[in-house]
């Protein structure tokens, strides 16, 4: 009986320990900004204009975290990274978070010293071809076709697997930078270009002289769950990034938007009351205050708003929600309970 009492008392004591700031969060507060690694330029996900202003789905994730942690979505330093640079920058501490259309794989998660914090975009790899080639399906790709692809990516590995499985003997022409790969494709050096379908839509919209002259083939050849990642070794920072992402999803499900975030504090819905910090201080589990999620949503909107503005119906890409819709609308996205 005494042993049981000791176990219960110990469990209660552990549960009562408040979250404390880890080294990454301490560093962020000290320098007054989050250092976010992004793509060198991918419309809809991370792209800078001529004034150096960054926009995109991956960019908004970092802004949401900055709003939650620093009370200012603009306190972010952007570090553009190629596919080959991204993990080194994260591992070395050059950046605090990698939010750069990066696929969550077992080898990356288990052996690179990083933690993926969730899926912000469910994608899949596809092909783009000139309309004049009259290739309407991956099933019609001829043997020995040349394909432009960026090296150091899952895209390159998937292309090799697809070619071998279908006995196509495809000829990859690889480039370190995506800009070089797309330039080679549009100049006619390669017959096809391959990357994630969201990337194909972005590249066709942004870089093609006439987007109508290029078709994205309908079949997917892989699953590509894209999401942010952080260095291992700081559980507090990992939890913050993970739960801000989940919070944006939960906000969409329960109707918390950029426009009504303040007013929703008057809601009597138990879940909304928790999300807004009215009935429960969920921020204490993360080392943040109770209004962390309200600030994030006020800064960039909920997940649905972020999606539609950057890659969906309100963007030039006009991509469908598909798998990125909420679970109760036929998609794969949902958050664990925030409580």
Question: Model segments located where?
Answer:
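Sec/Tat-exported extracytoplasmic proteins
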Residues: 29-32, 65, 69-73, 94, ...
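Extended ligand-binding regions for polar small-molecule ligands
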Residues: 60-63, 67-69, 131-135, 144-153, ...
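Acidic, polar ligand-binding/catalytic clefts
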Residues: 63, 67, 71, 75-141, ...
């Amino acid at each position: 009986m005494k042993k049981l009492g000791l176990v219960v008392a110990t469990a209660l004591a552990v549960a009562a320990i408040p979250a404390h700031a880890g080294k990454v969060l301490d560093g962020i507060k000290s320098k007054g900004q989050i250092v976010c690694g992004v793509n060198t330029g991918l419309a809809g996900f991370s792209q800078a204009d001529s004034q150096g202003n960054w926009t995109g789905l991956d960019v908004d994730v970092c802004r949401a975290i900055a709003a939650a942690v620093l009370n200012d979505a603009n306190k972010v330093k952007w570090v553009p990274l190629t596919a080959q640079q991204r993990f080194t920058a994260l591992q070395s501490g050059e950046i605090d978070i990698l939010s750069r259309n990066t696929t969550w794989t077992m080898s990356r998660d288990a052996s690179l010293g990083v933690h993926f914090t969730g899926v912000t975009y469910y994608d899949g790899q596809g092909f783009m071809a000139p309309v004049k080639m009259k290739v309407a399906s991956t099933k019609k790709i001829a043997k020995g076709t040349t394909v432009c692809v960026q090296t150091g990516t899952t895209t390159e590995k998937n292309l090799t697997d697809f070619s071998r499985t279908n006995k196509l003997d495809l000829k990859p022409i690889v480039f370190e930078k995506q800009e070089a790969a797309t330039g080679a494709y549009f100049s006619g050096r390669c017959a096809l270009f391959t990357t994630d379908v969201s990337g194909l839509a972005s590249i066709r919209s942004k870089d093609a002289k006439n987007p109508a002259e290029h078709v994205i083939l309908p079949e997917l050849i892989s699953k590509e769950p894209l999401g942010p990642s952080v260095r291992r070794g700081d559980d507090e920072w990992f939890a913050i990034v993970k739960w801000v992402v989940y919070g944006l999803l939960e906000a969409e499900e329960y109707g918390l938007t950029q426009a009504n975030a303040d007013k929703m504090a008057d809601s009597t819905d138990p879940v909304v009351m928790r999300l807004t910090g009215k009935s429960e201080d969920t921020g204490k589990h993360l080392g943040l205050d109770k209004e962390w999620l309200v600030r994030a949503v006020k800064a960039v909107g909920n997940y649905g708003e972020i999606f539609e503005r950057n890659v969906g119906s309100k963007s030039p890409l006009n991509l469908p929600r598909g798998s990125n819709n909420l679970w109760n609308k036929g998609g794969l996205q949902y958050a664990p309970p925030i409580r």
